[in-house]
């Protein structure tokens, strides 16, 4: 694997955004003529709506440093190593926890589905977009999650947007962990319910909030199972006890728990043996299950209510045949090859021990998500760039992804990483960490 030299930022992206510069780049001249001497239309004034667009400069300021780390282009399958700019790079930023995105069995299943069903469903689940594949997948997921019923959505984001906004009405309360995923935040904003956010994974804070609410009010406690940036696990046994005491419902976002925690990778509630105490469990297919889409699992009556009232479901096209078939194949592999989850945890242990022994701060991580805290925005971008130059792809996380002062590099392990790859990445972390005085 060769070290990767990042592409230099273009001058167009790094220079200040001025009208005269736009004219210069496009061949315009101040006399109202273009480069050919013919007249052009006057540049219209900026509409009030778009003033925020023209004054936005955060991305340009980062580009100007030469450290802009977003929208990097990959020209290969998502695997333990990927190709960028024609060079191989070790991938430590993927959410493919079981390493299935490039599995030949899943690719064969998607090809077969396209050959039988075509490329899309051309409609919503509510109308003409329900395939027998969707029904089969919902049944298999209900069995895995030990719930009466499951409903598929086209993306994981849509699940949280649709479920929270539909379930929580104007007289209801939503109690949300402050570190919840953005999709849960947006679902709460879209709902008519009143939202109260409690300190991250703080059950005392949640207890105080619950005690302040009317006994007769509807209450939904919504949390991540595994928090996507911190890598810690919700204190679910304590949470469900509080929910019972205060007559509240519980919804767990298991996007980063499926394929990682619980029996056969079935998630956080299974991990803590409290499945019956969690009313709704959300999962996504874009991580361990090597596809795209999401689901909500719960009792049959609630799922039927969502089928007929959840607008992100009703007014979105259904999951494609290829995506659905990929999940079915991935579920089969996850059930029949438990050694994958075991290897994921072995890899996590090796990387975590290595990073800690080097002196890095990993916070309270308990999962294959390992946050390497820099607590500094510039150092986060510098660290990301230097690791890329050393042939390591990693994701930087700064505000608003985390609060200011909690900036980090997010390491995520895959079951298919080798110990050799992990050890090589640790060597790069040691080298760059010392350069930046982080260790």
Q: What are the residue ranges of the model-derived segments?
A:
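Active-site phosphate-binding strand-loop segment of PLP-dependent enzymes
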Residues: 196, 200-252
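Conserved N-terminal alpha-helix of the aminotransferase class I/II PLP-enzyme fold
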Residues: 108, 112-156
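Active-site C-terminal subdomain of aminotransferase-like
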Residues: 246-249, 256, 261-366
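Conserved PLP-binding catalytic core of the aspartate aminotransferase-like
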Residues: 342-351, 356-391, 401, 406, ...
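Conserved PLP-anchoring active-site segment centered on the Schiff-base-forming lysine
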Residues: 163-182
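N-terminal "arm"/small-domain region of PLP-dependent enzymes with the aminotransferase-like
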Residues: 2-39, 47-119, 248
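PLP-dependent enzyme catalytic core of the Aspartate aminotransferase-like
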Residues: 1-38, 43, 104, 108-112, ...
């Amino acid at each position: 694997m060769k070290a990767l030299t990042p592409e230099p930022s273009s001058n167009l992206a790094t220079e200040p955004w001025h009208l005269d510069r736009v004219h210069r780049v496009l061949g315009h001249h101040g006399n109202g003529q273009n480069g050919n001497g013919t007249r052009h239309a006057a540049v219209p004034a900026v509409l009030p709506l778009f003033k925020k667009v023209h004054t936005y400069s955060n991305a340009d300021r980062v580009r100007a440093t030469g450290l802009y780390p977003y929208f990097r282009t990959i020209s290969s399958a998502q695997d333990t190593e990927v190709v960028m700019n024609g060079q191989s790079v070790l991938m430590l930023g993927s959410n493919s926890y079981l390493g299935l995105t490039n599995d030949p069995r899943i690719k064969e299943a998607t090809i077969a589905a396209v050959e039988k069903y075509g490329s899309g469903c051309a409609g919503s689940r509510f109308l003409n977009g329900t395939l027998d594949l969707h029904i089969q997948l919902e049944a298999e997921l209900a069995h895995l999650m030990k719930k009466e019923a499951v409903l598929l959505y086209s993306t994981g984001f849509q699940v949280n947007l649709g479920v929270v906004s539909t379930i929580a009405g104007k007289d209801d309360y939503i109690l949300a962990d402050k570190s919840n995923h953005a999709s849960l935040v947006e679902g709460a904003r879209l709902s008519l319910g009143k939202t109260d956010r409690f300190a991250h994974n703080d059950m005392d804070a949640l207890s105080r909030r619950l005690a302040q609410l009317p006994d007769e009010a509807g209450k939904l406690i919504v949390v991540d199972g595994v928090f996507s940036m911190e890598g810690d696990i919700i204190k679910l046994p304590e949470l469900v006890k509080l929910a019972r005491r205060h007559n509240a419902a519980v919804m767990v976002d298991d996007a980063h728990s499926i394929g990682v925690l619980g029996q056969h990778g079935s998630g956080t509630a299974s991990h803590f043996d409290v499945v019956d105490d969690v009313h709704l469990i959300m999962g996504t297919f874009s991580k361990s299950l090597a596809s795209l889409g999401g689901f909500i699992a719960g009792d049959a009556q609630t799922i039927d209510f969502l089928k007929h009232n959840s607008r992100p479901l009703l007014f979105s096209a259904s999951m494609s045949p290829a995506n659905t078939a990929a999940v079915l194949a991935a579920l089969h592999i996850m059930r029949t090859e438990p050694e994958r989850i075991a290897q994921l945890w072995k890899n996590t242990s090796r990387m975590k021990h290595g990073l800690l022994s080097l002196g890095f701060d990993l916070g309270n991580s308990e999962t294959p998500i390992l946050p390497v805290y820099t607590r500094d925005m510039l150092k986060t971008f510098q660290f990301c760039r230097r690791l890329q130059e050393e042939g390591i792809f990693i994701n930087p996380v700064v505000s608003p992804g985390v609060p200011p002062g909690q900036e980090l590099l997010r390491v995520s392990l895959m079951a298919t990483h080798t110990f050799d790859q992990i050890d090589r990445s640790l060597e790069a972390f040691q080298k760059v960490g010392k350069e930046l005085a982080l260790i």
